[in-house]
Amino acid sequence: MDATYEELERNDIKGPQEAELLTHAYAGFWVRFWAFLLDWLVIWGLNHLLVSPLFTVLDLPKTSGMFTFSAYSVTTLIVYLAYFALMTKYFRQTLGKMVFGLKVVSVKQDSKLTWSTVIFREVVGRYIDKIWILYIVVAFSPTKQGIHDYIADTTVVHEKLYRK
């Protein structure tokens, strides 16, 4: 840089400028919806590749006569809940979120996802979201959080998309 002392004085440089703090962009309703549909397909595949053949080989009934819950439906529910809980705890994202470049983060700064947070978010949150209209909250929330996100202090963000 070629400048004279007088030119530098006239520019009135006060010191290094602060870098703008960039944060991850929140994931909206539709991208989360498509990620969930992809996860649902993965779980459907797991159940049809592992659980269904196991029940067939062991000659166990997949339905029960009088009761709402059969051993098969309970097993598929366990696969469903375990998939979301384990993937979120260990990878902060499910396969659907990986494909769409999303991840689950804690709202608290530099806070890791604890087992209690993940269990609540993914297990209890799945029951809250059974009332589909409650999931619409994601579309209208400024931080794009669902009811389960608000209660668990989490949110879903884009991995490689930032906002100022």
UniProtKB/Swiss-Prot annotation:
It comes from the Bacteria. It is found in: Cell membrane. The keyword Transmembrane applies. The chain crosses the membrane at residues 35-55, 66-86. Residues 26-158 form the RDD domain. It is a multi-pass membrane protein. Pfam families: RDD. The keyword Transmembrane applies. Keywords: Cell membrane, Membrane, Transmembrane, Transmembrane helix. GO terms for cellular component: plasma membrane. This is Uncharacterized membrane protein YteJ. It comes from Bacillus subtilis (strain 168).
